[in-house]
Structure formats: C-alpha cells, structure tokens
A protein has these predicted regions:
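Short recognition patches in nucleic-acid-associated and regulatory proteins
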Residues: 243-271
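Cysteine-rich micro-motifs
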Residues: 264-286
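N-terminal pre-Walker A segment at the start of P-loop NTPase domains
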Residues: 1-6
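NTP-binding/hydrolysis catalytic cores, primarily Walker-type P-loop NTPases
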Residues: 221-244, 251, 291, 295-300
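Switch/connector loops and helix/strand junctions flanking conserved nucleotide-binding motifs
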Residues: 55-59, 111-119, 168-174, 209-213
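Walker A/P-loop NTP-binding active-site region of P-loop NTPases
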Residues: 7-97, 102
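Conserved P-loop NTPase nucleotide-binding/switch module
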Residues: 105-139
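Phosphate-binding/switch region of NTP-binding enzymes
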Residues: 23-25, 146-233
Length: 300
C-alpha cells in the first residue's frame, strides 16, 4: 500500500500572494495600492501596514495623480519590528478588510534587518543562549521568520508585501549622451529565498516599470507601469476555480496529509467536533482533551 495519497486535482480559487521589490523611489507603495484597489474596487477594503515612518499616508486621497487614490485603511507599525508584532498587525488588518480585502505590508524588509527584526533576534540568541553562536542561532531565529512568512501566506485575505532592494550604482549614458551614475536595485533586503515564497514577485525600477521575476499566474514576461487594471486582471484569474475548504478555527485552507484527503479530513472533523477543522487544529483539541483528562484524574 502506498504511503502517498494521489487524487485528481481540482483548481481552487485563491488569494493573491505578491511581493514587490525595488529601490527607493521606484513606486512600490503606490503600485501595491493600485493593485489592491483593482482587486477590491473599494479603498476601504485596502489596509496598509506602514513601517516607513508615516510615508504610507502620502498617497491617501490623491486627486492630483494621473490615477487618483482614495482613503484606504491605515496603521503605522512602530519599532520594534519583531515578527510577532508583524503577525499581530496582519491579523488585525484582515479583521478590518475581510476575506475579500487586501492587506499591504510596507515594508517587509524591516522585519529582517531593522530594530527587533530577525537579525536582531539571531544576535540576541547568540549572545544570551548557552552553546549558541552567530551560526547555530539561525536555527531558532529562522523559526520566527518562517512563522511570519507562513502567516502572511495563510491569512484569509489577499496580501502584498513590499521589500527594499539593496542598492548599487552603474554608469549609463543619459539622453544627452553623457555617462552618469544610475541607481540600480539588486536583491531584496530580506532572507535570500523570501521572494520564492510568494506566487508573484516583481522588481520595480527607477522608471516605475515593473518586471516579473517569479510568476505562477499569467504574468510571465510582464514589463509595464502598474495600474489598477492589473489588479482587476489578477482578481479575474484568482477567482477561477472552486472555493477551498477552510478551517473553522484558524481560517487556514485545509490541506491533505499523506494518508487523508481534504474531503476525509472535513468529514471526520465535522463528525467528531461539529465543524470543519484542519489537522493542526484537530491535534490541538486532542492534546487539550488529554491534558484535561489527566488533570481530572489527578484531582480524583
């Protein structure tokens, strides 16, 4: 008997999981807002988590722009930029905009290399934990990073993160034929593999042109300035398919295991607990029941 459970695949409706990377001035925030508005058609269904010292407010209700903006939901995330505070902010934003809304994390880079971020956590572990150093501390610090990324990818709303790009300069000819230094973006300021966690990753240049670097949708080869039209096209694509089964307790999509299909997990949890539950939440309930039973035995 096989240890793996194969079944015919059915495409499910999905949520946007996008990363926008670019140098300072590339237009990451405005691009994220335009995509979010294109998806929702309602600025109050867009929540911006701002770590950029209030700069996220600059784009609100801008009628002077070629494509005007409205009044979106907003929260400034102040230091420390710990993964736990990011997670709390994201979950709060989801509760505000709902499952058809968009949560923008601007910027995700602060969770990595700013005050209270993962690099700070790694250094603190190396300094204070016996037997730990800058190398061995990564095992524990990486769990904070993974938990944050997994939360952003699992919440029941669309999510967009922006990331700063490490900057360098190259000499290029300008329109007058003179050689001048030009700022270029390199890798995102985040863990090396972060952009691969998202379904879509785009690099935005100083000319505001966004180029797809990773894509699982229809955007391979995309190279253009981002407008709300892109959000509309993405929504149409994401809405194709059936609604995935979600856990009634944690809200995450219920995934199959090596031995059980989603249908079997849903049927079993409804029979035993009266609601749809993922395997993790079922395990929590079972552990809690065992602890309560043991406590009752000790009382007896």
């Amino acid at each position: 008997m096989s240890d793996f459970n194969f079944g015919e695949v059915t495409r499910e409706k999905s949520k946007l999981r996008m990363a926008l990377c670019g140098v300072s001035g590339a237009g990451k925030t405005l691009s994220a807002l335009y995509i979010a508005y294109g998806i929702t058609g309602d600025w109050k269904k867009v929540a911006l988590i701002d770590t950029e010292h209030g700069r996220g407010k600059f784009y609100a209700d801008r009628q002077d722009l070629e494509i005007p903006t409205g009044k979106y939901m907003y929260c400034e995330l102040e230091p420390p930029y710990s993964p736990d505070r990011y997670i709390s902010a994201v979950k709060s934003a989801v509760s505000v905009v709902g499952e058809d809304g968009v949560v923008i994390v601007d910027s995700f880079s602060h969770a990595w290399n700013n005050e209270g971020g993962v690099l700070d956590i790694k250094s603190e572990i190396a300094k204070t934990r016996p037997g730990k150093n800058d190398y061995t501390a990564w095992d524990e610090a990486g769990k904070y990073q993974n938990n944050l990324v997994n939360t952003i990818l699992a919440v029941n709303a669309h999510t967009i993160v922006t990331m700063r790009a490490k900057m360098a300069y190259a000499m290029e000819l300008n329109d007058k034929g003179k050689t001048v230094p030009v700022k270029i973006g390199l890798a995102p300021v985040q863990r090396d593999d972060t952009e691969y966690e998202f379904d879509i990753a785009m690099n935005i240049g100083r000319d505001h042109i966004a180029v797809t670097s990773k894509d699982t949708t229809f955007l391979d080869g995309f190279a253009s300035v981002i407008t709300p039209e892109l959000g509309k096209e993405l929504k149409d694509w994401l809405d194709k398919g059936v609604n995935p089964e979600r856990c009634s307790d944690c809200g995450k999509v219920i995934r199959p295991t090596d031995t059980r299909t989603v249908a079997q997990i849903v049927e079993g949890s409804q029979k035993c607990y009266g609601r749809k539950l993922c395997i993790n939440c079922v395990s929590k309930i079972v552990r809690q029941q065992k602890q309560e039973a043991k406590a009752n035995e000790n009382k007896g």
